[in-house]
UniProtKB/Swiss-Prot annotation:
InterPro entries documented for this protein: Actinoporin_PFT, Anemon_actinoporin-like, Cytolysin/lectin
An example Gene Ontology molecular-function term: toxin activity
Domain-level remarks: Composed of a long N-terminal alpha-helix and a core region rich in beta-sheet structures. Before the pore formation, the alpha-helix binds the lipid membrane, partitions into the lipid-water interface and stabilizes the monomeric molecule on the membrane. Finally, it traverses the bilayer, thus forming the transmembrane pore.
Family: Belongs to the actinoporin family. Sea anemone subfamily.
Protein localization: Secreted; Nematocyst; Target cell membrane
Gene Ontology terms: cellular component: extracellular region; nematocyst; other organism cell membrane; pore complex
Name of the protein: DELTA-thalatoxin-Avl1a
Organism of this sequence: Actineria villosa
Signal peptide from the UniProt entry: 1-21
Keyword Repeat: no
Function: Pore-forming protein that forms cations-selective hydrophilic pores of around 1 nm and causes cytolysis. Pore formation is a multi-step process that involves specific recognition of membrane sphingomyelin (but neither cholesterol nor phosphatidylcholine) using aromatic rich region and adjacent phosphocholine (POC) binding site, firm binding to the membrane (mainly driven by hydrophobic interactions) accompanied by the transfer of the N-terminal region to the lipid-water interface and finally pore formation after oligomerization of monomers.
């Protein structure tokens, strides 16, 4: 009997602390399980989902995220990271991108729900070419109209400067050279380095945006209800 009591005591002494410790190992978050340490301060930092070609929560869009995306492109003389926050109350579906010069290594995010933001990048063509990253992207909105965003990061800053623009077109309209020329030359393009606010004139929407002035350009735009 005495041997049984000693055995029971040793069993309980070993098993009880282990059982309590396990309660701190697994924490549920939604439908996922994350393995954590007992000390919450030692939890691993979550990896950011902010990569070019992705859609993130609109509230997360900031210039520092665009800086991170630019760093991932590498050493290219002319490049741009674009973030467009959809606070329009509408769903956006990608149409296309037209390039006056340059290209992109990522696909334009296909769907952007309300309260989400799209991330996109463009760069000058590879090789020793004196070209910039210049073009326009287009999204069809659930209202039936088209949202167009023009961006221009020129190669020669002696003659040109960074410009951007936004316009809502009636109906579905794919980006092309005509759209680019209109937004660059005839629709009051926006200069860099200052925050711009503008009524877009359709669907009860307005914009708020900012573009940096250097060759590693960042363009952040919020499309909101007026």
């Amino acid at each position: 009997m005495r041997h049984f009591v000693v055995f029971l005591y040793m069993f309980l002494a070993l098993s009880i602390p282990t059982a309590f410790a396990k309660k701190h190992i697994v924490t549920k978050k939604g439908n996922h399980q994350d393995i954590t340490n007992d000390n919450e301060g030692e939890n691993a930092e979550k990896k950011s989902a902010a990569v070019a070609g992705a859609v993130i929560a609109g509230g997360e869009l900031a210039l520092k995220i665009l800086t991170k995306i630019l760093d991932e492109i590498g050493k290219i003389d002319r490049k741009i990271a674009i973030g467009v926050d959809n606070e329009s109350g509408l769903k956006w579906t990608a149409l296309n991108t037209y390039y006056k010069s340059g290209a992109s290594d990522v696909t334009l995010p296909y769907e952007v729900e309300n309260s989400k933001a799209l991330l996109y990048t463009a760069r000058k063509s590879k090789g020793p070419v004196a070209r910039g990253a210049v073009g326009v992207l287009a999204y069809k909105m659930s209202s039936g109209n088209t949202l167009a965003v023009m961006f221009s990061v020129p190669f020669d800053y002696n003659l040109y400067s960074n410009w951007w623009n936004v316009k809502i077109y009636d109906g579905e309209k794919k980006a092309d050279e005509k759209m680019y020329n209109e937004l660059y030359n005839n629709n009051n393009p926006i200069k860099p380095s200052t925050w711009e606010k503008r009524d877009l004139g359709k669907d009860g929407l307005k914009l708020r945006g900012f573009m940096t002035s250097n060759g590693d350009a960042k363009l952040v735009i919020h499309i909101e209800k007026s």
